[in-house]
Amino acid sequence: MAVGKNKRLTKGGKKGAKKKIVDPFSKKDWYDVKAPAMFNIRNLGKTLVTRTQGTRIASDGLKGRVFEVSLADLQNDEVAFRKFKLITEDVQGKNCLTNFHGMDLTRDKMCSMVKKWQTMIEAHVDVKTTDGYLLRLFCVGFTKKRTNQIRKTSYAQHQQVRQIRKKMMEIMTREVQTNDLKEVVNKLIPDSVGKDIEKACQSIYPLHDVYVRKVKMLKKPKFELGKLMELHGEGGTGTATKATGDDTGAKVERADGYEPPIQETV
């Protein structure tokens, strides 16, 4: 047998000695996720992030996180087929302040609307809000039987489909172009845009199940903390009450553990 160290044996003693198990959750912190003031329920839940260590700052790991929440949870409502995407834009103390990032219909709702003997009409348009957000809106609508109609099918002619699609694009452009993001979200919550399209298209062909089925965020303006604070109900004032999240429209405060962002230049 060759004389020398046995490299396979661990330094501490016996071969295969157990490693010290470290709980990964001991290095992590819980942060509250806060929805903007447009919604009734402000406290969405909690999110987990690794604690600040050296150059790795916890708040940097949280910024840009997207949360998908049902509108039923945001509005304390029974209508649960709309999902809103909210993105973390800033961290104040233990609160993640979010902003609107997109909207979608649930898959089961979309599947339940598609049926035989009717025409499905879809349209999409890219529109810029007054405060510089570029959104892509997708709309969907279905033809329905006229009153006293005996025929089983209710198919629209190609010319009618084109007219309805044009009307959809006009209304979506008008509703978004003349408003800022906050007002657009307030219109998306009850889907007043879909109802307007349904009314406007009655003269061309009667429609039902008209919805803005999806909203995509394409471009955002440069981030401004003041505007985000306004969305969360702080209205530009320096002092505000702490956001508990249990009540509706609560304000967010900079907590004691607030870490200012690191500046690249002094």
Swiss-Prot record:
Comp. bias intervals (Basic and acidic residues): 244-257
Localization (cell): Cytoplasm; Nucleus; Nucleus, Nucleolus
GO annotation, biological process: ribosomal small subunit biogenesis; translation
InterPro entries hit by this protein: Ribosomal_eS1, Ribosomal_eS1_CS, Ribosomal_eS1_euk
Region (Disordered): 234-266
Keywords: Cytoplasm, Nucleus, Ribonucleoprotein, Ribosomal protein
GO MF annotation terms: structural constituent of ribosome
Coiled-coil regions listed: none
Any matching Pfam family: Ribosomal_S3Ae
GO cellular component, one term: nucleolus
Assembly information from the UniProt record: Component of the small ribosomal subunit. Mature ribosomes consist of a small (40S) and a large (60S) subunit. The 40S subunit contains about 33 different proteins and 1 molecule of RNA (18S). The 60S subunit contains about 49 different proteins and 3 molecules of RNA (28S, 5.8S and 5S). Part of the small subunit (SSU) processome, composed of more than 70 proteins and the RNA chaperone small nucleolar RNA (snoRNA) U3.
Homology family: Belongs to the eukaryotic ribosomal protein eS1 family.
Function: Component of the small ribosomal subunit. The ribosome is a large ribonucleoprotein complex responsible for the synthesis of proteins in the cell. Part of the small subunit (SSU) processome, first precursor of the small eukaryotic ribosomal subunit. During the assembly of the SSU processome in the nucleolus, many ribosome biogenesis factors, an RNA chaperone and ribosomal proteins associate with the nascent pre-rRNA and work in concert to generate RNA folding, modifications, rearrangements and cleavage as well as targeted degradation of pre-ribosomal RNA by the RNA exosome.
Name of the molecule in the record: Small ribosomal subunit protein eS1
